[in-house]
Curated annotation (Swiss-Prot):
Annotated NADPH binding sites: S82, K83, R249, G250
Species: Burkholderia pseudomallei (strain K96243)
EC numbers, comma separated: 1.7.1.13
Protein name: NADPH-dependent 7-cyano-7-deazaguanine reductase
Enzyme class: oxidoreductase
Length: 274
């Protein structure tokens, strides 16, 4: 299915009864082909979706709430278009379920079917809300650099590494990522963490490269994969991991993670802007 056929940018009818058919899958393959990603994938990882506006009725008609987290594997053939995800979650609001476990089971079944892969789902009930943490991405901030930047279309030529120098291990972060929805043109704001082992990457060039996404159109997952492959090709690190946390829209935030080496799943602590 193509993004232009999705609910994005169209008049919306909000369903008030559970409806799994509202989920609109979008194949990953098309966007990957555009940037030269084929099989085998040069990375693995997860897309972490947090849904803050989930509610349903219990068997006695009393509303229940929870925060849902979805872990979608990067190797899944499809992603779910975000507005369709919002409409799907909204369809739970007037539907009775026996338990939170029954809601979680329905979410796992439906989203896994849409993505054509096994999706992990976790629910945080109100009793657990105080345990949820807020934190910023760890690393050396690129935003400390005082530089000129005038290119706002993606330009990987900014990416360079000093291959004659000794390898380093660095974690770099920036809060200056902005891209745009390919269907509606709405801005998407994010923070990015880049961890690598290899020849030292030029910090100013890396920041200018991230800034060059400012007028770029692409879904969150696609932007992170573009960042990953551009750095991998231009700088040739031995190890590379890219993690982005995008601000919330429609009660959902999307946080893609891509890596080419085994490591623990990144924390799912929301940032201040989320």
């Amino acid at each position: 299915m193509n993004p232009e056929h999705s609910p994005l940018g169209k008049a919306t009818v909000y369903a008030n009864q559970y409806d799994a058919s509202l989920l609109f899958p979008i194949p990953r393959a098309g966007a990957r082909e555009q940037i030269g990603i084929g099989a085998p994938l040069p990375f693995f990882g997860t897309d972490i979706w947090n849904a803050y506006e989930l509610s349903w009725l219990n068997a006695r008609g009393k509303p229940q709430i929870a925060i849902a987290t979805f872990y979608v594997p990067a190797e899944s053939p499809n992603i779910v278009e975000s507005k369709s995800f919002k409409l799907y979650l909204g369809s739970f609001a007037q539907t009775a379920f026996e338990s939170a476990d029954a809601v979680r089971d329905a979410l796992k079944r439906d989203v896994s079917a849409a993505c054509d892969a096994s999706v992990t789902v976790r629910l945080a009930t109100p009793a657990e809300f105080r345990k949820l943490q807020m934190d910023e991405l760890d690393g050396l901030s690129l935003d400390r650099l005082d530089l000129d930047a005038h290119v706002y279309e993606t330009d990987p030529s900014f990416l360079t590494a000093s291959h004659g120098e000794a390898p380093v291990e660095e974690t770099l972060v920036t809060d200056l990522l902005k891209s745009n929805c390919p269907v509606t043109g709405q801005p998407d704001w994010g923070s990015v963490q880049i961890h690598y082992v290899g020849a030292p990457i030029d910090h100013a060039g890396l920041l200018r490269y991230i800034i060059s996404f400012r007028n770029h159109t692409g879904f969150h997952e696609q932007c992170v994969e573009r960042i990953f492959v551009d750095i991998l090709r231009a700088c040739q690190p031995v190890k590379l991991a890219v993690y982005a946390r995008y601000t919330r829209r429609g009660g959902l935030d999307i946080n893609p993670f891509r890596t080419n080496y085994n490591q623990p799943m990144p924390d799912n602590a929301r940032t201040a802007r989320q």
